A protein has these predicted regions:
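A compositional/biophysical signature of low hydrophobicity enriched in polar/charged and small residues
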Residues: 1-78
């Protein structure tokens, strides 16, 4: 499994709704609310060889009230 993170900017007042939709979809490993330019930080795992760009485009960015995303690819956990 390959881990990666997505920072999500939501439409105003919609952060909790987006977090709940992500949780209901059962595609995220962990979901955190954050301060700063983005509202949520979400950890995902995909199978080796999965196209992360397509996953984010088709599974994450299609959730209503998501305004913007930033994907963070990680190399190694310590």
């Amino acid at each position: 499994m390959v881990p990666f993170f997505v920072q999500i900017k939501c439409h105003l007042g919609k952060s909790y709704e987006v977090a709940n939709k992500l949780a209901d979809a059962e595609i995220a490993s962990e979901i955190y609310s954050t301060a700063g330019d983005f509202d949520l930080l979400v950890k995902f795992y995909v199978e080796d060889g999965t196209d992360i760009g397509h996953f984010v485009n088709e599974k994450v960015q299609t959730i209503p009230d998501i305004q913007d995303t930033r994907t963070i690819i990680t190399f190694k956990a310590f």
